[in-house]
Amino acid sequence: MRYNAGSYDIVVIGAGHAGCEAGLAAARMGCKTLVCTLTLDSVAMMPCNPNIGGTAKGHLVREIDALGGEMGVNIDHTFIQSKMLNTSKGPAVHSLRAQADKKKYQERMKKVLETQENLHLRQLEVVSVEVEDGKVKGVLTKNGAFFECKAVIMTSGTYLQSRIIIGDVSYSQGPNGLSNANELSKSLIDLGIDLRRFKTGTPARINKRSVDFSKMIEQPGDEEIIPFSFISGNIDRDQVSCWLTYTNEETHKVIQENIHRSPMYNGSIKGVGPRYCPSIEDKVMRFQDKDRHQIFIEPEGDDTEEMYVGGMSSSLPEDVQVQMIKTVPGLENAEIMRTAYAIEYDCIDPTQLKASLEFKNIDGFFSAGQINGSSGYEEAGAQGIVAGINAALKVQGKDPMILTRSDGYVGVLIDDLITKGTNEPYRMMTSRAEYRLLLRQDNADFRLTEIGHNVGLVTEERWSKFQERKQNLERELERLKELQITNKTENNEKIVELGSTELKKPIRMYELIKRPELDYFSLACLDPERPDLPKDIGDQINIIARYEGYIQTQLEQVAQFKKFEKKVLPEDLDYNDVNSLRIEAIQKLNKIRPLNIGQASRISGVSPADISVLLIFLEHYRKTGKNTDN
């Protein structure tokens, strides 16, 4: 029986990585918030890989943190290994990755939600979102409870009508043996929301006691632990190792002989899988020129024997999985604890969303995370914090926070989803960001903390630490640009000792740092009055000095980009009325409804000629007395 169960400012459906960030952001901004989850035991669960960060994903975690989110703080408290990736490459692609203790990560995040002021965490299944006159009114649960609210954030992950597939066996279930949600999809369809089916998967978990690590290559963590959060401070912790091994011809033979039993190849799986995280059977069949593939054996926590078999995601039958795993060096006697599986689930077409992550046709209804067609904990958390902030701003009667492609990877992620859409689970990569030298993980706070503070999410403690860090960097850069190093013998002897060439004339310290064989730290011997600053300040100075020319070029590109972003397109424009647009462009523009010329130019099917037509139209529109510039 239906009953009125109370009212909230914001209701969040789901408590995965998107839901946690969304709920915390809304509550911390002063909104009375209800976070619903199918089970309290799955809050912030990691159903797949036991780590946070990685290439491009580490950038997202830093950006979540810079805005005032929780993911970075939480992993800093619960990681069991820390590693900086891509250090042999340029600073734009350096990415932090941390191996998580999955249970501790969950437990701490759940505690944060439980103790957060303005936030109520409840075990409930939402079966419908109720809308009246195009505006959210509330949500209804399976038990008949109706919660009135001003905004809803859907963060339902991979649970909507999800189906587990292992070989020729399939059944209705959520990830990791949990129940799924089968009724909410119908409510979304009734609201006119387009759904599609995607697929993802996870590898087996094996018992650590059954692994022969002597046949593998140890992968230890870094000696220097770099935190994810800008407010974590120094961390000193014992770390555990991961291990590297490889598949071989025997592994590939087992897969090839049983490929007809793979649901990916016999048509049992209808959903589209992730291109950049293929199953082991997909890798073997697609890349037959490769005689081996990397397999990483990763611990899932301090208090468990479960080991994650990274790189061996599969939906092959269980008996084939057993054969396959035992062909890998070090896994000859491996005991499977959890079978690998594929999971199909409903998700939305993200082009139905605005840049604020609010549905275009439903006032107050937001969506974030894997339900939007993305993959990964970090992508989900990034969308979650944006949706949470914007739902809170909506309730407060304020304009939304829109992050652009020049603001951060979060902006790139959202712009790609809402502008281009996606036909497969979307994964963030550094190559997707045009301005990646400006969007480094080390400067996420310089880019986003002020924005987080302006919307009311960044705490005064975090703001104070940021201000101090910003002042330290600016003052030190100014000092280095003024500090002159003379070409006296004593200085030249030290410079030669450092592997560089003598000075012919005096030079500013800032210019000296640009020499590839020198850096800020090695030149301390020529700088006796240098202030005692944190190491990360020196790291940033090295990047800013050495890449100054490239950074300036990208800043000029951003200025050009912003010119097009400022040319706003009318919200109610019917593109059928714009003369000379091609039919395909009219269809795409009417569907996506871009905010501005910049976004319009990134829509697949809209040509440069179409953009020229729109610019002419806007000029005429402006001359008739309607302003289209921000």
Swiss-Prot record:
Indicate which residues the UniProt annotation says bind FAD: G14, A15, G16, H17, A18, G19
Q: Where does NAD(+) bind?
A: 273-287
UniProt-listed InterPro entries: FAD/NAD-bd_sf (IPR036188), GIDA_C_N (IPR049312), MnmG (IPR004416), MnmG-rel (IPR002218), MnmG-rel_CS (IPR020595), MnmG_C (IPR026904), MnmG_C_subdom (IPR047001), MnmG_C_subdom_sf (IPR044920)
Q: Output the SUPFAM superfamilies linked to this UniProt entry.
A: FAD/NAD(P)-binding domain
Q: Name one Pfam family in it.
A: GIDA_C_1st
User: GO terms for molecular function, please?
Assistant: flavin adenine dinucleotide binding
* Compartmental location: Cytoplasm
Q: Which NCBIfam families match?
A: mnmG_gidA
Subunit structure and binding partners: Homodimer. Heterotetramer of two MnmE and two MnmG subunits.
Tell me the protein's name.
tRNA uridine 5-carboxymethylaminomethyl modification enzyme MnmG
**Species assigned in the record:** Clostridium perfringens (strain ATCC 13124 / DSM 756 / JCM 1290 / NCIMB 6125 / NCTC 8237 / Type A)
